[in-house]
Amino acid sequence: MATIFAIETSCDETAAAIVKNRQVCSNVVASQIKIHEQYGGVVPEVASRSHLEMLNQVIAQCLCEANLSWSEIDGIAATCAPGLVGALLVGLTAAKSLAIVRQKPFLGVHHLEGHIYASYLTEPDLQPPFLCLLVSGGHTSLIYVKDCGIYETVGQTRDDAAGEAFDKVARLLQLGYPGGPLIDKLAALGNPQAYPLPEGRISVPGGGYHPYDSSFSGLKTAVLQLVQKLKKQNNSVGADGFLPASTINDIAASFQETVAKSLTKRAIDCALNFGLTTIVVGGGVAANSGLRKHLQAAAAKHNLRVLFPPLKYCTDNAAMIGCAAAEHLQRGHTSPLTLGANSRMAVSDIMELYNSH
């Protein structure tokens, strides 16, 4: 059983965790949401500086909560791709330094593989093959999980990621940042059938549509046009220039319903067509109540098993990175200390991060 000390700094969460196979010994996350809120989104340079300021404190707290010494740690891991390069470098450099000083194996981990492994933390018997629906602020993908490190992307967004669309629509509705939780909250108060919105399908040469790829830019534009149209109707706008709360709730509900149904349809069709009986959901949008409701209901109809990670493992954290690293280390995979940070990297290239022994 491998015990891993892991660091995650790919975007705006400074995180460290200690994981013993699938058991979390400690999991510390310092969020930068309050810092980036004023900008309406993540500012890369600000994120990197904040990681530098917070990381030592997060590492110390992580060790303290686990009540473990370095002699009990088998390997040290950090997210190395994809993400904001400056942010990644902070965690990557810290992990390499610790690996050298403590004389431990080092492992670079792909951020999306971490999200795949988030459900492993609470599902001790989960094993491939299965389908992963990965939905976050930066990614929306359907990934065929064949084995540890062996993945095939069978569907993805052609433009905005689902989480990105939530943030942009929240901005259109003047709700604030981050948009996902805010829209989810208001959607519960609105009518999801109030405004029909386009699903966003991808046409293919020769006719028809791609069965698993998605598009959210058209949906975002449709919401923009709807907001503009409603604002032109004098009775729809208050003296402050804002739409009434009930209208905003209905738009939020209609938007969330459209995204949830679109993702659910593609995930169910994909699992059935590939003969997979389990769908694992990962990423920040996995926390969305609309997606959870639609996917669980549709899966039950088709006798498919759907696994959502606990809410604390949906958003970025280091426990999921440690879980993935533990599996790799047990298979004899380690990374060279020359490994760099990458803003982009396909999940099909993950094994390039490791030397196999």
What do these predicted regions represent?
Residues 14-19, 132-134, 140-144:
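Short beta-strand scaffold segments in enzyme catalytic cores
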Residues 108-109, 296-320:
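Conserved phosphate-binding/catalytic loops in two-lobed NTP-binding clefts
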Residues 309-347:
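Glycine-rich phosphate-binding/hydrolytic loop that grips phosphoryl groups
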Residues 1, 109-131:
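Conserved phosphate-binding catalytic cores of ATP/NTP-utilizing and phosphoryl-transfer enzymes
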Residues 2-82, 111, 115, 251:
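N-terminal beta-alpha supersecondary unit
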Residues 124, 147-191, 220-229, 234:
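Glycine-rich phosphate-binding loop plus the immediately following alpha-helix
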Residues 70-80, 274-286, 307:
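Short glycine-rich phosphate-binding loop at a beta-alpha junction
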Residues 185-279, 290-297, 301-302, 349-357:
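A contiguous, well-structured pocket-lining segment that forms one wall/lid of small-molecule binding clefts
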